[in-house]
Curated annotation (Swiss-Prot):
Related illness: Hyperammonemia due to carbonic anhydrase VA deficiency: An autosomal recessive inborn error of metabolism, clinically characterized by infantile hyperammonemic encephalopathy. Metabolic abnormalities include hypoglycemia, hyperlactatemia, metabolic acidosis and respiratory alkalosis.
Transit peptide, UniProt annotation: 1-38
Cofactor section: Zn(2+)
Protein name: Carbonic anhydrase 5A, mitochondrial
Enzyme Commission code(s) on record: 4.2.1.1
Residues noted as binding Zn(2+) in the record, renumbered to the chain: 130, 132, 155
Length: 305
């Protein structure tokens, strides 16, 4: 599917292993590329990861992610509750290079770290968080706002511990996952992010892993808790439509040097031809008949930070 053996043994193998090979037994069919002007830069960039050089979606999929969020078209819902976030720093386990991105894993055996409230009816346990980024600062986020792509995007992935026994079940279950998305923009140095940046040289190659001291990921969240929410999917195979997305309106600032450090990682394993870990985002998907709900009312001010 990906063409070169080096890609098959790196990013693609990771995706299959992480998302459970049995799910790939479902037939996959080409999906249409996003036709919106908003994704022109992202999809015209010819250095997309090979996983996305051929459009892929799930058969009959109607709620694929990521999407372009039209600020003015989002619908204010006064019944949306504040999101409650409670993360236990000690539940942080390790950081590793998956072959597609770098990921920080958490102990999800208890309710110690998780979220509730917002658009969610149940408690969701934190499983992991990771980032997506581009080769250049003009794009790299998976979601966009009014056609604007940010340099990177943080995803905190949670699973419904009330309805399901474990993460694997939740991935394929209704209302199984909740993902908080946070945009990164260039600006001031981010002190907490630097803790991750300092470890990246230890996980340069695929499958490399490093221990983590206690880490509270709430320190990576913006100070403003306004958000958009919509029904979507995973943005990596198996692309299951089990995700409630919670996209924070306010981006967080990171220094250019910190984002550049992300680009020092490799898709490839030690001994393989080196492939820079950049452009690890999925192209935009059509909104179709979905609505994007907002926890805040639109104003006459600028549409983005």
């Amino acid at each position: 599917m990906l063409g070169r053996n080096t890609w098959k043994t790196s990013a693609f193998s990771f995706l299959v292993e992480q998302m459970w090979a049995p799910l790939w037994s479902r037939s996959m069919r080409p999906g249409r590329w996003c036709s919106q002007r908003s994704c022109a830069w992202q999809t015209s960039n010819n250095t997309l990861h090979p996983l996305w050089t051929v459009p892929v979606s799930v058969p009959g999929g109607t709620r694929q992610s990521p999407i372009n969020i039209q600020w003015r078209d989002s619908v204010y819902d006064p019944q949306l509750k504040p999101l409650r976030v409670s993360y236990e720093a000690a539940s942080c386990l390790y950081i590793w290079n998956t072959g597609y991105l770098f990921q920080v894993e958490f102990d999800d055996a208890t309710e110690a770290s998780g979220i509730s409230g917002g658009p969610l009816e149940n408690h969701y346990r934190l499983k992991q968080f990771h980032f997506h980024w581009g080769a250049v600062n003009e794009g790299g986020s998976e979601h966009t706002v009014d056609g604007h792509a940010y340099p990177a995007e943080l995803h905190l992935v949670h699973w419904n511990s009330v309805k399901y026994q474990n993460y694997k079940e939740a991935v394929v279950g209704e209302n199984g996952l909740a993902v908080i998305g946070v945009f990164l923009k260039l600006g001031a140095h981010h002190q907490t992010l630097q803790r991750l940046v300092d470890i990246l040289p230890e996980i340069k190659h695929k499958d490399a892993r490093a221990a983590m001291r206690p880490f509270d990921p709430s320190t990576l969240l913006p100070t403003c808790w306004d958000y958009w929410t919509y029904a979507g999917s995973l943005t990596t195979p198996p692309l299951t439509e089990s995700v409630t997305w919670i996209i924070q309106k306010e981006p967080v600032e990171v220094a250019p040097s910190q984002l550049s450090a992300f680009r020092t990682l490799l898709f490839s394993a030690l001994g393989e031809e080196e492939k820079m870990m950049v452009n690890n985002y999925r192209p935009l998907q059509p909104l179709m008949n979905r609505k994007v709900w907002a926890s805040f009312q639109a104003t006459n001010e600028g549409t983005r930070s």
